[in-house]
Amino acid sequence: AFVTYVIALAGVYTATMVPYNAMIGTTTSNPVDRGNLSTSRTLAGFVGAMGVTAAVLPIVNFFGGDKQAWTWMAALFGGISTVLLLILFKNSKERVIESAVAVEKVPLKKNLKALLQNKYWVIMILYMLISFISSGLGGINIFYAQWILGDPAKVAVIGILSFMPIAVGAVFMPVLLSKFSKKTITLIGGIVMMIGLLIIAVFPENFTMIMVGLIIRGLGIAPGAVAAFAMLGDVADYGEWKTGIRSEGLIFSAGTFAEKVGSGVGGLILGVVLGLGGYVSQGATQSTEALFAIKAIFAYLPLAFTAICILLILFYDLDKKLPEIAEDLKAKRVNG
């Protein structure tokens, strides 16, 4: 089972998601269209995740509710995913054609060197890594509901309010992207996130205020969640313009890498901080230090990570250069 899980998640999933995400940059060179594609990706991802979550138990019960039923459930979802990916393959087209120089096979070492010369790639990978580290702290929700709020059942509400506002906020991203740059909406989103987290930090035991804070935080997450992968497409354009090497595969695979590593590091930090706080898993009560550790993971650390992300995005000034880059690349491809 472990081997199957590793092959499925680390192998098949990664091999699928890298080109899937890269298509945001290869299907169009228009920055606004890339934002709209990323919005669709984010919304469909949330709807799909919620749909799968809601359907799991009914499907398992339909197949008998035993151990074998879980296998049939996984096979069913796998089959549906395969069909949808084949439909995507059949109906998608890569419209961003590389110049003759850029399309030549480039050694991996030279590719990596070109990436490191792309300051916007470095900024975005650090931004995504820290964002996913913060997201990886979400496992603290059950601890917070039990030990800070005194009601484990409230974890369901916390979970819903951690994700639903993101989906709602994503709906408005196409309008915002048509009026503002990706940097601007990402910065605004970061500030909104900090406001939500500050509310939670100031009222750590007031469930009403926590719900308000979670809603505000979720609305703030939406711009960055939508814009990040669209920005990677712009980063690929900049890389080709600056170095003559277009490395969409490596650029977007690094985004997937940041997602996996960040989530793992977030989980690791969660365990380490709980341990340092003296959390006792089977204890009837927890020490003041352990309760502080839970609050820190739920609000204080995400607040710090959000501040770092805002600082990183302040150095991202690629949006204003995109018109010039687009014209130069268009001319190069025509003449290449």
How should each PLM-predicted stretch be described?
Residues A1-G336:
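Membrane-embedded alpha-helical bundles of multi-pass transporters/translocases
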